């Protein structure tokens, strides 16, 4: 997404703001050795923790996504993580694991605060 914004909107990564929304947390996301190995190849950082069972690992998707954003040039101070686990909040959010395969949808509504609107957009009529 960052690369797309650079190519199509001339965005500079250091000026972008990113949010990581609700998803499964590290405590709830157990993965196999095979999945863990694939993540180790891409993320040498600490995105895996020892699992609760032998040969299992807890995967931190929030850290993995922050790592992707850092590599893309987004400064850490321009990132926000909701720290809301979909598995811990099934009454509000859908979780594939918590619902044993039943699925739903999540949506995000984003907007620019007037103070954040870049100069190139200041002439756009407000709704």
Positions of predicted regions on the chain:
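Active-site microenvironment for binding and transforming phosphate-containing groups
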Residues: 1-127
């Amino acid at each position: 997404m960052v690369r797309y914004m650079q190519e199509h909107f001339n965005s500079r990564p250091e000026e972008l703001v990113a949010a990581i929304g609700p998803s499964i947390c590290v405590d709830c996301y157990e993965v196999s050795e095979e999945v863990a190995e694939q993540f180790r190849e891409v993320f040498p950082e600490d995105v895996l923790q020892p699992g609760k069972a032998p040969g299992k690992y807890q995967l931190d998707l929030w850290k993995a996504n922050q790592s992707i954003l850092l590599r893309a040039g987004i400064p850490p101070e321009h990132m926000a993580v909701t720290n809301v686990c979909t598995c811990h909040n099934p009454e509000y959010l859908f979780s594939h694991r918590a619902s044993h395969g039943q699925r739903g949808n999540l949506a995000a509504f984003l907007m620019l605060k007037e103070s954040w609107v870049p100069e190139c957009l200041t002439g756009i009529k407000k709704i």
